[in-house]
């Protein structure tokens, strides 16, 4: 069994340890979770995080990169992008994790270090980048592209043919109509219905979703 560490000791990492990894192990495609690494000043040697040891700061992985792989469990897209890209450039291997009940259709691709939560569905001919998070019960339509390090929260639906950029944060229960383009670094607030393209770096909110310049 391959050995794994989670980078990030917050709620995201603890969810992955508690729900996704046990299911993968039951299927025989899992990992031995060695522990958690996190740069937080509150952690010290000997600390346990929901039953798993805190191993050290993120540079810990550099000394063990030939023996273990890593999954970045940091929710913020931009922070995750900086960390995962830096570690990949240094030869760290990143594992993709898939939860119970998730379905990934044939001819779809998932990049390294992505996390697919339970009951999420990815339709045919989709391209999902590196370090992407698809939370519980997300629905991805056919021929969708999702850029690296984008995070999509529970219950969101992305219709066929949409192109989602890199480092995009999409809240829960969002719906994006077919064929829309969401620019890099955009943020879509929870519950929004997106009928139009969204420019890079902007924040949209509501039904129909409109730009909120005051929040940018």
Please name every model-derived segment.
Residues 41-103:
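Phosphate-bearing ligand-interacting subdomains
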Residues 23-46:
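NAD(P)-binding Rossmann-fold cofactor-contacting core
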Residues 6-7, 37, 73:
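Short hydrophobic segments within beta-strands
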Residues 3-4, 32-34, 67-70:
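Short active-site oxyanion
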Residues 20-24, 87:
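Active-site catalytic pocket residues across diverse enzymes, especially alpha/beta-hydrolases
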Residues 12, 42, 210:
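Conserved Rossmann-like nucleotide-cofactor binding loop
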Residues 2-21:
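Glycine-rich adenosine-cofactor-binding loop
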Residues 96-212:
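Structural signal for interior beta-strand "rungs" in well-ordered beta-sheet cores
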């Amino acid at each position: 069994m391959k050995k794994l560490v989670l980078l990030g000791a917050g709620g995201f990492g603890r969810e992955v340890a508690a729900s996704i990894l046990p299911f993968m192990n039951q299927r025989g495609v899992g990992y031995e979770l060695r522990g958690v690494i996190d740069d937080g000043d509150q952690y010290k040697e000997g600390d346990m995080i929901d039953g798993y040891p805190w191993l050290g700061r993120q540079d810990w992985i550099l000394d063990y990169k030939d023996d273990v792989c890593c999954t970045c469990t940091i929710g913020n897209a931009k922070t995750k992008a900086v960390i995962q890209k830096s570690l990949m450039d240094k030869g760290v291997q990143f594992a993709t994790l898939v939860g119970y009940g998730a379905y990934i259709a044939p001819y779809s691709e998932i990049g390294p270090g992505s996390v697919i939560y339970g009951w999420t569905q990815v339709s045919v001919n989709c391209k999902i980048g590196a370090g992407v998070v698809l939370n519980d019960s997300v629905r991805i339509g056919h021929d969708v592209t999702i850029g690296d390090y984008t995070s999509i929260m529970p219950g969101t639906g992305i219709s066929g043919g949409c192109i989602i950029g890199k480092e995009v944060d999409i809240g829960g229960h969002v719906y994006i109509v077919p064929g829309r383009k969401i620019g890099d670094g955009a943020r879509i607030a929870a519950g929004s219905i997106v009928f139009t393209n969204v420019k890079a770096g902007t924040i949209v909110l509501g039904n129909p979703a409109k730009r909120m310049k005051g929040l940018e």
